[in-house]
Amino acid sequence: PNHSSNLHEWFKEALASEKGSAARNRYIFRDGKGANGELPPSDWVSHFAPSSWTHESTFGGKNNQWFLHWFAPEQPDFNWENPEVHEDFLKTLKFWSDRGVDGFRIDVAHGLAKDLSEPFRSMPVHEGLEQRGNKGKGIWGDRNEVFAIYKEWRKLFNQYDPPRVAVAEAFVHPERLPLYASTKTLGQCFDFRFIETPFEAHAYKVATKEAIELAQKNKSSCTWTLSNHDQIRHATKMGLNPAVNRRAWMLSDGTSHPLDKESGTANALA
């Protein structure tokens, strides 16, 4: 819900529309800096590009504006300050819920709300994990305003029997996880501690204990996550290299094969 494709009909309509139009207001377009608007509106950087802003002429736009994307230029961000965006997502969620889906995985759940007040705050280094300490007041990640969106969704989900499930993908400070896993918002949130925790028994024990205590304190839940499509799969990290003769490996004490000095030698993503 943070962004669409640049090939989405909405974005193509936005590029073909005039400045200030309703079609462009579904996304985040701004005039550039410089004498002729040739510079990005701010110094914000993205996950996948040097700048979070791309000039619309890249995709055929003719209004000399820039659009915001926290990820790739081909993934323009929606403007969640626009009620039409809210309404369209509720329509989409209802469409699939009416057809019997059990639930939804919410990608980049922490990223929808943004501080678009001008002049823009400076962010020459991607906020990324640094937003974990912003207590809901960063530029992009984990802003408090995002929970109003999910409360809208929860009201819709609870109209069904059983209620529709939702799980957030949100890289946030552990103390903020219950806000996404609350029964008033999405209900579940992936806990990425096991991805970030060293593969060591005591570290896993501490991470597990902290997560359970936090969930109990806030009457939320734990949704353990060992890997996902953005990370090395745990089958790769922990599994035996396919080239290894398993019987010989076991008889040699399980450590001596040169191709298996450590687990995860394939180092494969999804």
Model-derived features with residue positions:
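Conserved alpha/beta catalytic core and glycan-binding cleft of carbohydrate-active enzymes
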Residues: H3-D43, Y150, R154-A270
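Acidic/aromatic-lined carbohydrate-recognition and catalytic surfaces
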Residues: P1-K94, D98, G111-P174
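Short, solvent-exposed beta-strand-terminating loops
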Residues: A109-F120, I232-P242
